[in-house]
Amino acid sequence: MTSSPELARAVAATLARHVTDVVICPGSRNSPLSLELIARDDIRVHTRIDERSAAFLALGLARSSKRHVAVVTTSGTAVANCAPAMIEAAYSHTPLIMVSADRPERLHGTGANQTIEQRGIFNVVDTDHVVDITDLNSISFARNVIHINVALDVPLVDVLPEVGDPVERVREVIEVDHGEVVLNLNERILVVAGDEAWEVPGLEDVPTIAEPSAPAPYHPVHPLAAQIFAHKEIKPEHIVVVGHPTLHRAVLSLLADVPVTVLTKTDTITGNPQAVGSRVKVTGELDKRWLQICEDASTLCADRVKEVLEGHGFTGLHVAAAVADTMAVGDTLFLGASNPVRDASLVGMPLGGVDIFAARGAAGIDGTVSQAVGVALDVQHRDATAIRADRTVALMGDVTFLHDVGGLLGARPENLTIVVANDDGCGIFETLEIGAPEFRPSFEQAFGTPHGVHIEAIAQAYGVNYLRAETLPELIEALIDTTDSAGFNIIEAVTTRSTRRDIDKALTL
């Protein structure tokens, strides 16, 4: 039978063939794995004390690098804490490996400490159960989300491991090819690009509604224009969906009323498309009148947003506009769920030359700080010779920030600015049905959830540089001040949510 140190050494060598970064958490049962990983020169090891944060850190690293990243934990509830990140990874097709240490079979069902049934704990992925070195040979890394459960018996460690032998790294291609579809450009075609979208050859000149995490299109169309396109006189005759759009109700409603072709490189196909592919062959020519209609509709909507911004006080929408205006080519942006990613879409994102990431798989707010840190760390590691790493900015709401404030703990990147749009609660609910006047008596307790937390005190407790902005000019100044200086910064933008419902109404065309 393989000893635990030998098995851990084999697991570490296997991981080294497929990953550059590993996040470890302190624990006894996973101690042989941690020691072997630290002993390797070909793996960057990050340490976090909270498994939930660790898994989201790994997810952020994976999003940015587009490579597998592993998180390694001890047994028991430590494993369960990785579930939210595993779910997001599965639904966003992000490569993530969860390595859980486990008790040997003889201890299961005996009431042994920190012993739960870990095989199959993540229903989004099957478990590769490893009890011997030979079990590693059957693990396929040609998939996005992987759970490796390693049974380790005592003695867990013997001597401090020597430096592991270098291995040849393998880069798996994890894509599904759905073939080619034919598109007739003589039709009024509109592209809707969501998360996981890519630049599709042949569609460069087609008008495109692009969500912030999609590539910046050559002919962008403002998302509010979907309301205009609902009129039958100018309704698109065909919509091409690239990736996974989720943000705007009007866009999703339009998709339900027009023939749709879906372009994807994954095995996930939603809706009821008339065709599915991964590449296109185009025929015909774009109608210049259709191009002009799309341009005019987009301009009308962009002007409406500017008009509304000028007519209302400092809100999260203003914060998103300030962030957009101060991003530069080469910067990276991570957008929190809920209002920030939608606000970013309304103020003109995506941006050319700026990498933009957002958690749009399961679209939860959890783990946002940790994911942003992971993205920034990957950006920082891209060029070890650079005097200063390219800047990463993260935009999120106050509740999202507080939900993952523990993500501030641990080794930090030196190139990250977190912008917190603080409206003292859950501003997105102001714009939904539950924010209507008849629900106000119960709104604050159940949905608004004001907290009154002093974010400056949090920054001080974690040793993070803090700036505060109560007006749009102050925010722009703070963003500019942090552009040319290395470090980890938190900018708190003190906003209001009292006008969000009025703003949403004003943006309904």
Curated annotation (Swiss-Prot):
SUPFAM superfamilies: Thiamin diphosphate-binding fold (THDP-binding) (SSF52518). It comes from the Bacteria. Signal peptide: none annotated. The keyword Transmembrane helix does not apply. InterPro entries: MenaQ_synth_MenD, THDP-binding, Thiamin_PyroP_enz_TPP-bd_dom, TPP_enzyme_TPP-bd. Pathway: Quinol/quinone metabolism; 1,4-dihydroxy-2-naphthoate biosynthesis; 1,4-dihydroxy-2-naphthoate from chorismate: step 2/7; Quinol/quinone metabolism; menaquinone biosynthesis. Its cofactor is Mg(2+); Mn(2+); thiamine diphosphate. Keywords: Magnesium, Manganese, Menaquinone biosynthesis, Metal-binding, Thiamine pyrophosphate, Transferase. One of its GO terms (molecular function) is magnesium ion binding. Binds 1 thiamine pyrophosphate per subunit. Pfam families: TPP_enzyme_C, TPP_enzyme_N. GO terms for biological process: menaquinone biosynthetic process. It catalyses: isochorismate + 2-oxoglutarate + H(+) = 5-enolpyruvoyl-6-hydroxy-2-succinyl-cyclohex-3-ene-1-carboxylate + CO2. Belongs to the TPP enzyme family. MenD subfamily. Catalyzes the thiamine diphosphate-dependent decarboxylation of 2-oxoglutarate and the subsequent addition of the resulting succinic semialdehyde-thiamine pyrophosphate anion to isochorismate to yield 2-succinyl-5-enolpyruvyl-6-hydroxy-3-cyclohexene-1-carboxylate (SEPHCHC). Homodimer. PANTHER family: 2-SUCCINYL-5-ENOLPYRUVYL-6-HYDROXY-3-CYCLOHEXENE-1-CARBOXYLATE SYNTHASE, PROTEIN PHYLLO, CHLOROPLASTIC. This is 2-succinyl-5-enolpyruvyl-6-hydroxy-3-cyclohexene-1-carboxylate synthase. The gene is menD.
